[in-house]
Design a protein with these regions (language model features):
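Short histidine-centered loop motifs in beta-beta connectors
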Residues: 141, 157-178
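Generic structural signal for buried aliphatic residues
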Residues: 96, 136, 175-181
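Short C-terminal domain-edge/linker segments immediately following a structured domain
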Residues: 126-131, 152-153, 164-170, 181-182
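Short hydrophobic beta/alpha edge segments that flank linear recognition/processing sites
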Residues: 122, 149-150, 176-182
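Extracytoplasmic/periplasmic cell wall- or extracellular glycan-interacting regions that localize
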Residues: 2-140, 146, 153, 160
Length: 182
């Protein structure tokens, strides 16, 4: 039980770190996009001033960036993801069983021992493939304890696929709904 708990904590810590890094990259992309838009507006304003030669119209200043802002593409993808809530496909092809549900659970045969699961555990038959639940971009692929783990960004959302025997995608790849990832 301690080994399983230690491995789960190690995996969760790695995933949390990668998600934090992905959020920071998205924040920087959004800031860069906002900077480019501001520069384009400034250039257009300067062009308007020189062409009209009289009077200026004050444009409202753009709002300051929030702690986490998204690019336009990420906002659109997030909206699509939310709109499909409850309609997303299973992240595995073929027959499967759910071996562990989300949240705390008691370990069979051990009194007063509880573990916490941050997702659901799905076991497929040999040859089953893990697949993306929605369009997105692969944020990270890493190996831990000999198994592959994949994080896919869907705008403001990230889906995590753990304990895969192989990975058929790499960081930066664009994936579509139901595409095999491992």
């Amino acid at each position: 039980v301690n080994k399983k708990r230690r491995e789960a904590n190690q995996l969760n810590a790695r995933i949390d770190r990668l998600i934090a890094e992905e959020i920071e990259r998205a924040r920087k992309r959004a800031q860069e996009e906002a900077r480019r838009e501001a520069a384009a507006r400034k250039k257009a304003d300067a062009k308007d001033k020189t062409s009209s030669g009289t009077g200026t119209v004050a444009r409202p200043k753009s709002e300051p960036l929030d702690a986490f802002t998204m690019s336009k593409a990420d906002r659109e993808l997030s909206g699509s993801f939310v709109a499909n809530r409850g309609k997303l496909p299973m992240p595995i092809s073929g027959p499967y069983i759910i071996t562990s549900r989300y949240g705390q659970y008691a370990v069979e045969g051990l009194r007063n021992v509880k573990l916490d699961n941050k997702g659901i555990d799905i076991q497929g038959k040999p040859g089953a493939q893990a697949r993306a639940i929605f369009d997105g971009k692969v944020a990270a692929v890493f190996q831990l304890n000999g198994l592959f783990n994949v994080l896919i960004r869907h705008g403001n959302y990230i889906s995590v696929y753990c304990n895969l025997s192989s990975a058929s995608v790499k960081s930066g790849d664009t994936v579509s709904t139901k595409q095999a990832i491992g």
